[in-house]
Regions:
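Residues in the signature-helix immediately C-terminal to the ABC NBD "C-loop/LSGGQ" signature motif
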Residues: 3-5
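C-terminal coupling/interaction segments
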Residues: 106-146
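Catalytic Walker B motif of ABC-type/P-loop ATPase nucleotide-binding domains
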Residues: 18-22, 27
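Helix N-cap at the start of a conserved alpha-helix in ABC-type nucleotide-binding domains
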Residues: 29-31
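The start of beta-strands in P-loop NTPase/AAA+ ATPase cores
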Residues: 16-17, 46
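Conserved protein kinase catalytic domain
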Residues: 8, 36, 83, 135-139
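ABC transporter nucleotide-binding domain
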Residues: 34-119
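A short, proline-enriched helix->beta-strand linker immediately N-terminal to the Walker B motif
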Residues: 8, 12-16
Length: 146
């Protein structure tokens, strides 16, 4: 409720830009959904700048993503373009125990009803390739920089 009131106060002066810092952190699922619906309704009328670490918020609310690294802008593009950074690098493997190549574990995933481990690997693998997400692209992008 406080966040909705804060947004309402910010909109009183009919601004061109609305800055939001971690706006959904700590919200329960229902309030988070309500908040996202408010943002969707107003984002056509003004520029909404959203600072968040919650990737699902970015995917559902943002048209473009700006990535900061050490205080510098390192990327500014669409969600799809950031996801494409990981294209051909995201795989579903049965086990990571025998992998000789470095990889980044992204957790469990189910493909065609079978459980796998989702990984990101710079080296091509003989495993089912997965469609990359914005989070996968972000991980690949950041690892390129470091």
């Amino acid at each position: 409720m406080k966040r909705r009131l804060g947004i309402a106060q910010a909109l009183i002066g009919d601004p061109d830009v609305l800055l939001l810092d971690e706006p959904t952190a700590g919200l329960d699922p229902e309030e988070r959904l309500n908040f996202k619906n408010v943002i969707r309704r107003i984002k056509g009328d003004l520029c909404v700048v959203l600072s968040t670490h919650i990737i699902t918020d970015i995917e559902s609310l943002c048209d473009r993503i700006l990535v900061l690294c050490d205080g510098r802008i390192t990327a500014f593009d669409s969600c799809g373009a950031l996801a494409d950074v990981a294209r051909g690098k995201v795989y579903a493997v049965e086990s990571t125990a025998d992998l000789a190549t470095p990889f980044h574990s992204m957790g469990p995933v189910t493909v065609d009803g079978k459980a796998y481990e989702k990984i990101i690997s710079k080296a091509p693998l003989n495993a089912p390739a997965l469609e990359p997400t914005v989070e996968d692209g972000y991980i690949c992008f950041i690892e390129k920089l470091s």
